[in-house]
Amino acid sequence: MNSLQLLDYFAMFAYFLVLIWIGVAVVRSKEKRNQYDSFLAADRNMNLLQTTSSAAATDIGGGFSIAMGGLGFTLGLSGSWMIAVSGLSIVMVSFLMVPKVKRWSDKVKGLTTGDLFAARFDRKTGTLAAVVIGLAWFTFVGGQIIAGGKLLQVTLNMNLTFAVLLSGTIILAYTTMGGLKAVIYTDVFQMIVLMVGIVFIAVPIGLIEIGGWNVLVEKFNSSESTKHLLDWGAVGWRQMLGWFFAVFPVWFISIAAMQRIIAARDVKTAQRGFFLTGIPIEWPLFAVGSTMIGLIARFLIPDLSDPEL
């Protein structure tokens, strides 16, 4: 095992140690004013950093982080437009939805989307909404669990099935013990790691490794099969339209987004946090940065069997 491998394992160990410490600290915290408010809505006291980080981490967590690298590998820079659509969506939500939802949730003291439906209509409607939301979220949470499993598979050389089961157990146990407050504190830490890792570490080191941006451009432009990787319009309008219909509505119906709005300190904090998530975090920092990692991987390992790994 060389020094780089040792450094990698040390970094992963330190990362998970910090996450465990955050969860334990939240569970043992005596600052909870109300048990349910703390568990479901983080005491309705999220500041701007927490709101922004948690909203961003909700969208660009493990699933998108892995997927965008894969899009960068196969589609190149134009793959970043998928996240640009998401960024546009959340900016629109910050103006059109955030103020109304935040004021309404504070007025009726609702802690969940089901509570808001119950307050607006009746208890049966609220219960039905909660059931539908729970069923729908199996798919989203499943994507995050699979992303975590793939990470464990690659980094620790695990069987994929076992890695996914382990990932799911950790995620569910962590959330159940610490509630939304633990998730939010974790989101802040993870967003710092993610953005610093992509923008200031992975991309610069990758470009240095291949000899710089000009070398990458020269190599990809030298072949017809890779020229499209540097073309911002390579995906075409049909693909863009598909992304728009698939991605743009998500923030308007996202239960995770609703929960972050409810948990924010006030309307202004929620609105600013969501806007900053769209611009500049999702676009251009994460979108371009993550696709650049895929491009660099295409340069270094063109025959990679699974672009998402």
Please describe what each predicted stretch is.
Residues 20-31, 98, 137-141, 145, ...:
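Hydrophobic alpha-helical segments and their helix-loop junctions in multi-pass secondary transporters
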